[in-house]
Amino acid sequence: MDWVTIVVYLLLIVFGWFSVCGGSYDYGDRDFLDFSTRAGKQFVWIICSFGLGFVLLMLDDSLYDMFSYLIYIGLMLLLIVTIFIAPDTKGSRSWLILGPVSLQPAEFAKFATALALAKYMSAYSFTMKNWKSSLMLAFLILFPMLLIILRETGSALVYSAFFLMLYREGMPGVVLFSGICAVVYFVVGIRFDAVMIADTPTPIGEFAVLLMVLLFAGGMVWVYKKRWEPTRNIIGGSLGVLLVAYLISEYVVPFNLVWVQWGLCALVVGYLVFLSLSERHLSYFLIGLFALGSIGFLYSSDYFFNKVLEPHQQIRIKVVLGMEEDLAGAGYNVNQSKIAIGSGGLTGKGFLNGTQTKLKYVPEQDTDFIFCTVGEEEGFVGSTAVLLLFLILILRLIAVAERQQSPFGRVYGYSVLSIFLFHLFINIGMVLGLTPVIGIPLPFFSYGGSSLWGFTILLFIFLRIDAGRNRRI
């Protein structure tokens, strides 16, 4: 049994409960174990999670492998049922009401998806290079993601973390690179869409993304083919033409430089297709597809942002990107959160002495924004201690995943790691104003039984698989 991970888990649970006490405390409260208060309810869920963890450790580890697909199917059916019978709670239909208990199936679908992926990828016939296998992996990840995104965007985005596990298991690096490029294209394209280059009618966002596409295409030719001549032709030719076009636009006749870039992109793609046919190498053709896909994503992301996203989602993104300052609206949570953290100073104001949190200036201060309670009451020292505990947990998960004797254990371990990383980075980023507010909890800290049980199940299934790793060779 990996006792280091269990000790870190217990410490996070304890610190998390005290943070819930601090975030939900009212001056009239006298008893933290009053089960009518959030602190009291969280205590009950913690005790239940200990019992749940114990049961998971007592089960035979082969059961998780044996029933992986059944668990996945069961949770997917529960997600479908949730769509139709869940009541409207704060504009979200993602909770099932079972008497006095409310459960969020999306939290439990994470471990089910991780088990299904581990089961499928541990099959003897599985190979990442097989396109049918890749389609099946995409289905296992995207199906719950699509079911959840109908009700809650934040919980659905967590499933993108599984691609980090896929990269560890041999997914081509270009796929991960494409995902990173998509984020960069979206941010740059949206952020600088209305900003022009000097005195020209050229939007910086569109120009910058198309320039990156041209440079990336040339760079990929060098990385994958080690051919200097086509690399020089693509990068050098593009930069030379754009320099001449800029000088003409600046000093002769102003025009949109993006028009020139469209022509350059067409020429580069045509050149890559020519190289692919003449040298009979598919790599050139795939690089051309990457360029076309990048251009398509640029213009479709603009449509997605303006036509698909809800107005409040657009405002949240604009606030994060510095395009708007809505301190009384969409930016209120983040602004108050940063004030609370900043007011904590080095050592904090002390347990239950936070003014921003006690006076309820920070909405969701014991759920999604609970880290601001830690920052205000425990200061920089306490916040650093909490982050160090999470760092120890992350490093331990990597070590335990790497020592697995079977693909099933390793894949599941890296799935757990990926989910924890996503939650940690996005939640802390939300509180600090570095990422959009998408409403996902901080593991073991945020108030709520569903998230606590979901993370406990994720972790303790992995610990049980690890305990039996020598029998899974």
Positions of the model-derived regions?
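Transmembrane helix boundary and interhelical junction motifs in multipass membrane proteins
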Residues: 152-158, 348-354, 365-367, 438, ...
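Hydrophobic alpha-helical transmembrane segments of multi-pass inner membrane proteins, especially
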Residues: 8-10, 14-22, 26, 32-328, ...
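Alpha-helical membrane-protein architecture signal
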Residues: 139, 330-334, 347, 363, ...
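Long extracytoplasmic/lumenal interhelical loops at the membrane interface
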Residues: 341, 345-378
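Transmembrane alpha-helices of multi-pass inner-membrane enzymes
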Residues: 216-219, 433-470
